């Protein structure tokens, strides 16, 4: 499993991401630029900065999709250890509980098991990034005015996946030999959301001590 995860983070060939960028599009070129910077060994704080002359919404869109794919993968590798029995509530330790709310089935905040919450979350995000009105892919079609607010909600909920995985399934990360890869993904995610102020500081509190240790 560790080898599989290592290969995935290296070349994205051992799994099928839920969303790809179309070759030949501006966003595909931005994605390639971002990936090249990651592989070059540059400091992650530098990697997340908006390249000169690029549109900030395009840059955010590329990263939201990439983080969705990677975090979906991280959770997927340990999903069998996150069950209705082991994780009856979506939580981040004893102090933090996350309830699910959407515009369809759960109009009021609902207490759900972690696997149920994760399934709804990934489907919800996939629906948004495949919605042309939210994440337009055609040249010349502008992003909606509330695009960054939508991305804030997506990234806030994805951060909660990190919270749950680190606090409740860190032993699984260690047993798979995946700690370095998950930490790198987290640091990349953290520097990005801080660079563009996309997640409220209060949401980051559950992992504050760990973040201070690995994101120094």
From Swiss-Prot:
GO CC terms of this entry: cytoplasm; nucleus
Sites where the protein binds Zn(2+): 82, 87, 164, 169
Keyword Zinc: yes
InterPro entries: MOB_kinase_act_fam (IPR005301), MOB_kinase_act_sf (IPR036703)
Matching Pfam families: Mob1_phocein (PF03637)
Summary of the function given for this chain in its UniProt record: May regulate the activity of kinases.
Family to which this protein belongs: Belongs to the MOB1/phocein family.
Name this polypeptide is given: MOB kinase activator 3C
Organism: Homo sapiens (Human)
């Amino acid at each position: 499993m560790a080898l599989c995860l290592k290969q995935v983070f290296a070349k994205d060939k051992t799994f099928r991401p839920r969303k790809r960028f179309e070759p030949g599009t501006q966003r595909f070129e931005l994605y390639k630029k971002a990936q090249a910077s990651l592989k070059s060994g540059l400091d992650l704080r530098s990697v997340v900065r908006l390249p000169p002359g690029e549109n900030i919404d395009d840059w955010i869109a590329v990263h939201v999709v990439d983080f969705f794919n990677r975090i979906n993968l991280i959770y997927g590798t340990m999903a069998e250890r996150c069950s209705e029995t082991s994780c009856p509530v979506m939580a981040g330790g004893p102090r933090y509980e996350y309830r699910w709310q959407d515009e369809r089935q759960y109009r009021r905040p609902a207490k759900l098991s972690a696997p149920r919450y994760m399934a709804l979350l990934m489907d919800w995000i996939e629906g948004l990034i495949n919605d042309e009105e939210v994440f337009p892919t055609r040249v010349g079609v502008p992003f909606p005015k509330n695009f960054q607010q939508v991305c804030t909600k997506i990234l806030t909920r994805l951060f909660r996946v990190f919270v749950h995985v680190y606090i409740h399934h860190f032993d699984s990360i260690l047993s798979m030999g995946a700690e370095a890869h998950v930490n790198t993904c987290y640091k990349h995610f953290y520097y990005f959301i801080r660079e563009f102020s996309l997640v409220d500081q209060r949401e980051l509190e559950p992992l504050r001590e760990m973040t201070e240790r690995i994101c120094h």
